[in-house]
Amino acid sequence: VGINVKCKHSGQCLKPCKDAGMRFGKCINGKCDCTPK
């Protein structure tokens, strides 16, 4: 699930994805993409 959070690497997406109520994420095309629970 893409969220509107800019990133350079996947580690930056851990907290934004948690805050969005999801598990973890990767950085895809400069934006975070989270995995739903």
Curated annotation (Swiss-Prot):
- Positions of post-translational Lysine amide modification: 37
InterPro entries given for it?
Answer: Scorpion_toxin-like_sf, Scorpion_toxinS_K_inh
In the record, the effect of residue 33 to R is given as: Toxin selectivity change from Kv1.1/KCNA1 to Kv1.3/KCNA3 (no change in ability to inhibit Kv1.3/KCNA3, but important decrease in ability to inhibit Kv1.1/KCNA1, Kv1.2/KCNA2 and Kv1.6/KCNA6 channels); MeKTx13-3_AAAR
Q: Which domain of life is it from?
A: Eukaryota
> Gene3D superfamilies from the xrefs?
Knottin, scorpion toxin-like
Spell out the subcellular localization from the entry: Secreted
Organ and tissue specificity = Expressed by the venom gland.
**A GO term, aspect molecular function:** toxin activity
Modification after translation, per record? C-terminal amidation is not fundamental for activity. It permits a slightly higher activity on Kv1.1/KCNA1 potassium channels (native toxin IC(50)=1.9 nM), than non-amidated recombinant toxin (IC(50)=6.7 nM).
- Disulfide bridge partners, by residue number: 7-27, 13-32, 17-34
Question: GO cellular-component terms in the record?
Answer: extracellular region
Does this entry carry the keyword ATP-binding? no
Any Pfam family the entry gives:
Toxin_2
Q: Supply the alphabetized keyword list.
A: Amidation, Disulfide bond, Ion channel impairing toxin, Potassium channel impairing toxin, Secreted, Toxin, Voltage-gated potassium channel impairing toxin
For this chain, the family text in UniProt reads: Belongs to the short scorpion toxin superfamily. Potassium channel inhibitor family. Alpha-KTx 03 subfamily.
Task: Fill in the misc note.
Answer: The primary structure of this mature peptide is identical to that of toxin alpha-KTx 3.6 from Mesobuthus martensii (AC Q9NII7).
Entry's free-text remark on domains: Has the structural arrangement of an alpha-helix connected to a beta-sheet by disulfide bonds (CSalpha/beta).
Q: What does this protein do?
A: Inhibits voltage-gated potassium channel rKv1.1/KCNA1 (IC(50)=1.9 nM). Also shows less potent inhibition on Kv1.2/KCNA2 (IC(50)=105.9 nM), Kv1.3/KCNA3 (IC(50)=8.9 nM), and Kv1.6/KCNA6 (IC(50)=63.4 nM).
Name this protein carries in UniProt: Potassium channel toxin alpha-KTx 3.19
Native organism is: Mesobuthus eupeus
